[in-house]
C-alpha cells in the first residue's frame, strides 16, 4: 500500500480518544513528552508524570499498543510513538452568576487525543558501537604498583 510520495509505510496502529474533558493546551504538554519515544518507555513516563492529563494519554497509548499487537500482529517491544497530537473538541458553555445580576461565561473545553505507534526494526550495532563495547585492556596489579613507585 503506497503512502505519501510512495514512501514505504511502516506497519503500525493508532488510537483516538474523543471528547476528553481536558483543555487541549494541558493535554498537549503531556503529549509532547512522549512523542518519538519507544512505546514502553512512553508508558513509564506517563505513569509517573504529575499532570492530570497523563492518565488519559496513558490510556490512549495503551490502546494503540494493544491495537498494534492484536490487529496488526506487531511486537509491543518494537513499537515507537511516531505521531501524537491533540485537537480541540467542542467547548461547553456554562454561566456563573456574578455581582449586580451579571452572568460570567465559563468555557469547559474538550479535546481529541490521537496516538500513532509504528514498528521499527531493531538497529544493527555499528562498528563504532562495537568498538565502544569492547572491554578495555586490563592491567595487572604488579604493573600498576611499579608505575606508582616510579612516580614517587
UniProtKB/Swiss-Prot annotation:
It comes from Salinispora arenicola (strain CNS-205). SUPFAM superfamilies: Ribosomal protein L22. NCBIfam families: rplV_bact. Gene3D superfamilies: Ribosomal protein L22/L17. Keywords: Ribonucleoprotein, Ribosomal protein, RNA-binding, rRNA-binding. It holds the Pfam family Ribosomal_L22. The keyword Cytoplasm does not apply. Residues 124-152 are annotated as: Disordered. PANTHER family: CHLOROPLAST 50S RIBOSOMAL PROTEIN L22-RELATED, LARGE RIBOSOMAL SUBUNIT PROTEIN UL22M. This protein binds specifically to 23S rRNA; its binding is stimulated by other ribosomal proteins, e.g. L4, L17, and L20. It is important during the early stages of 50S assembly. It makes multiple contacts with different domains of the 23S rRNA in the assembled 50S subunit and ribosome. The globular domain of the protein is located near the polypeptide exit tunnel on the outside of the subunit, while an extended beta-hairpin is found that lines the wall of the exit tunnel in the center of the 70S ribosome. This is Large ribosomal subunit protein uL22.
Amino acid at each position: 500500500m503506497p503512502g505519501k510520495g510512495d514512501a514505504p509505510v511502516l506497519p503500525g496502529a493508532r488510537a483516538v480518544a474523543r471528547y476528553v474533558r481536558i483543555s487541549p493546551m494541558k493535554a498537549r504538554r503531556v503529549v509532547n513528552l512522549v512523542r518519538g519515544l519507544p512505546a514502553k518507555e512512553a508508558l513509564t513516563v506517563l505513569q509517573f508524570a504529575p499532570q492530570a492529563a497523563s492518565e488519559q494519554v496513558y490510556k490512549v497509548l495503551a490502546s494503540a499498543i494493544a491495537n498494534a499487537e492484536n490487529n496488526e500482529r506487531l511486537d509491543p517491544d518494537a513499537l515507537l510513538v511516531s505521531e501524537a497530537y491533540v485537537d480541540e473538541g467542542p467547548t461547553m458553555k456554562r454561566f456563573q452568576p456574578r455581582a449586580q445580576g451579571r452572568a460570567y461565561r465559563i468555557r469547559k473545553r474538550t479535546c481529541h487525543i490521537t496516538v500513532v505507534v509504528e514498528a521499527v526494526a531493531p538497529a544493527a550495532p555499528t562498528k563504532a558501537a562495537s568498538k565502544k563495547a569492547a572491554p578495555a585492556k586490563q592491567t595487572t596489579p604488579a604493573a600498576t604498583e611499579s608505575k606508582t613507585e616510579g612516580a614517587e
